[in-house]
């Protein structure tokens, strides 16, 4: 079994959150579906990715609305309400003409 999510889209919002003893950043991205609906239009989804620790700090520091990103991560089901959330583990983005990549374990490639 393998739990893997990969999303490509545009940053809509970067929102830091604080819960008791835990800080994370919710990254909202807009993803356009690669096919047309019955009306012949492309639909767009806004998805929230939760980034913890070092990854969350760098996402908050470096990503802005309109930035193109690719996010690799996993789904996690909440014990409280049973809903699934996306947990970010690797974020790639273009900044100042260069590609940047950030891992949840603190590795950063430029």
Locate the predicted segments by residue.
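Single-stranded nucleic acid-binding surfaces, predominantly the OB-fold ssDNA-binding core
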Residues: 1-110
């Amino acid at each position: 079994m393998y739990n893997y999510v990969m999303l490509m889209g545009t940053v809509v919002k970067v929102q830091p959150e604080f819960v008791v003893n835990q800080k994370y950043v919710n990254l909202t991205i807009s993803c356009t579906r690669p096919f047309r609906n019955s009306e012949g239009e492309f639909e767009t989804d806004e998805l929230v990715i939760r980034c913890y620790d070092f990854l969350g700090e760098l996402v908050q520091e470096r990503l802005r609305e309109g930035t193109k990103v690719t996010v690799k991560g996993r789904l996690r089901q909440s014990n409280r309400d049973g809903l699934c959330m996306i947990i970010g583990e690797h974020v790639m983005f273009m900044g100042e003409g260069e590609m940047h990549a950030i891992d949840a374990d603190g590795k950063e490639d430029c």
